């Protein structure tokens, strides 16, 4: 859009594209399937909606949630490249998130993108924050906006610097306010805004034990050691345990194409942090007494990790189903087959973090988790997930190669030491890095 309210069409594709794939995943409406049937002569009212089983393709999808898509920027591979927004495409993939509010959906999308700004905001003065990070449209800008609000900037000031509509900036401001509340010991506003318990604990002065965070204010990580309120806990336990005791749990909602007007039977879910007086309990329709396994997907496509790993995840799901075991997928990439609602027994469109996967394990009563089929993303979540499952005392294990063995194989120094200990010959080698 433009300041005058006009919209400019950049391109039109007369075919199924990544945009239509995103629209399908966001609404649950099977655009490609319906398009194929229309091309064969079917009318919309003759095509059944498989999700509800009661309506037809002539019903326009209605949604009662917010969907956010963010690009995956390969800044970790090209540290010296300028990733300023322009006519040339520089992202390698994308992540999608679903939440009840814009704030919740945005924070889930930032976690899902697995992007970590290579900047310590505590070392960035206001002038540099404005000139380098707010005025310039770069991958760091969303985090800079949150940091600016946390420093006391107003909506009007940030609007002047970024040109972003005030409605969106007001939501960014609410996220920053929720973080400030968490820093002062009020955890529920941060939970409802979409922060994870691990993120809230880190904001409050505790440790962060997970793979990726959406945003943690610089002041929270630079807190004064003498500031007792940062590390005090109510019950003598860890900060994250206090956060869990004082906040609402995640409930899982269904993507049904009709905003709850008709009963849906397709197992396509997303989580929401709502207070007990919210819109009801979990909507998951899964038999918790059947043996089941959670398969962790690969998240957004990046250099070195593409759709070949999604192929692995989908075939893992099919192998489990052939064995009579329910397979549940957790992933957030709208471009993949694993996030089709009819690929698995349960699709959870969620960030790939230990906390959120552990919530899915609790919800489904899963017997095991497979992290070997999503590339480095899913392997990286193995260790914190094992810790989280143990902390919650859940009867669920990482299946296949153990987390310890995975680390042993990936850590070249440890692997070389093991080969020497076992007296197994290997070529001489070394590692070098420019950073």
Can you name each region flagged by the protein language model?
Residues 1-181, 190-193, 217, 222-229, ...:
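ATP-dependent carboxylate activation and anion-phosphoryl transfer catalytic cores
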Residues 13-14, 362, 406-435:
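Active-site nucleotide/adenylate-binding loops and adjacent lid/helix of ATP-dependent enzymes
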Residues 42-50, 119, 156, 201, ...:
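Acidic/polar loop patches that form or flank catalytic/metal-binding clefts of enzymes
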Residues 185-204, 263-279:
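Intrinsically disordered, low-complexity basic tails/linkers immediately adjacent to helix-turn-helix/homeobox/MYB/SANT
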Residues 323-324, 391-406:
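Short, acidic/small-residue loops that bind anionic groups at enzyme active sites
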Residues 367-373:
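Periplasmic-binding protein-like
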